[in-house]
Amino acid sequence: MSSERFSPNQFRHASSITHPGEFRDGRWHTFTPRAPVERVLLGRSWLLRPGLTFTPYANPTRCNAHCAFCSEELARIDAMRLSAHTTISGYDRYFAALDRAWSELRGFEMGLSLSGLEATSEPEWLLRLLSLLDVHSALFAERVLYSNGSGLATDERLVPALARARFDRAELSRAHFDEKLNQRIMRFGLGQPIRRGEVFSETVRRVQREGVPVKLVCILNTQGVSTIEHVERYLDEAEALGVGHVVFRELSVLGDIYRENRETRWIAAHRAPVRALMDVILDAEGHTRAGWTLEGVTSGYYYYNERYRRGRIEVTLEGSSYVAHRDAVGSGVLQKLVFHSTRELCGDWVPNSQVVGCYD
């Protein structure tokens, strides 16, 4: 349902690329921003980036997994608190505030990015959100769920509801198809059926049968998938499930803007560079690995990716920088909108940064 006008990033077709290395070296710095749009929100004038995404930060409960690389546990040095530690309470008040925020944004086309902790962990919250989305359907040109799939595996209402809400895709995270290796990295609660490989596979098939495309998300790391051989085995497993799109994401560049904790130490110890995979698949001389075809490259305001075709699967190799994100956030233009559990709308994942205001 994505419209032609909605363009959150810049895609360059392979036919226009003579030297992919210049984009690999420049990465997100090759992104050219469009002119911002001025909007009045809660009585103040703000500049918004065209094509931005809106995230109702999904934390109706604490997360039911404890991924070793969890970005929601990263504490930026300017953060006074983490949204992950303040769960949503008082649904009537919360959804009334979200309704007011969406009403004020009417006419500004956005993408809906349903992420945060685990959006499917509390089905009643998700179903109510989807009902409100139906009221504001015209606001969102693209709708994406980011999930570990846990609630989709246990509540039969959720997948049909996503299909009725016309979600463009569900991005389901899986670090490895080997159940034990995946559990070592994603650390699901022992009572979560999705931790089992056969449950995950059946959930992927069922989501696709209901008409919601699935993109599998694999976070590159040295405990799981890190080499081209690992990548190709993962793709073979994905193809067997009928999946048409897989993204391999490098752990984001953190710089020195985060407080040291368990997650930053794990990331530093287990980072696997996506550039190494890019150079193996398409080298500096333009030779492409057998079975792979470059489709193009995409630049965003804090990320860069290359898109390939391998067999029936579209493959994305992606890198990003939370430092670039922080710098863009401080540019005076809201790059993203996040509706936090406190009913505050912000232009940042950090709830005390770029605060538009509270919609109570």
Language model segments and positions:
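Flexible mid-to-C-terminal extensions adjoining Fe-S/redox cofactors in radical SAM and related proteins
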Residues: 15, 73, 77, 323-360
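Radical SAM enzyme [4Fe-4S]-AdoMet core and its adjacent flexible, acidic
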Residues: 83, 180-197, 205-328
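Core AdoMet radical
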Residues: 73-93, 105-122, 136-154, 164-200, ...
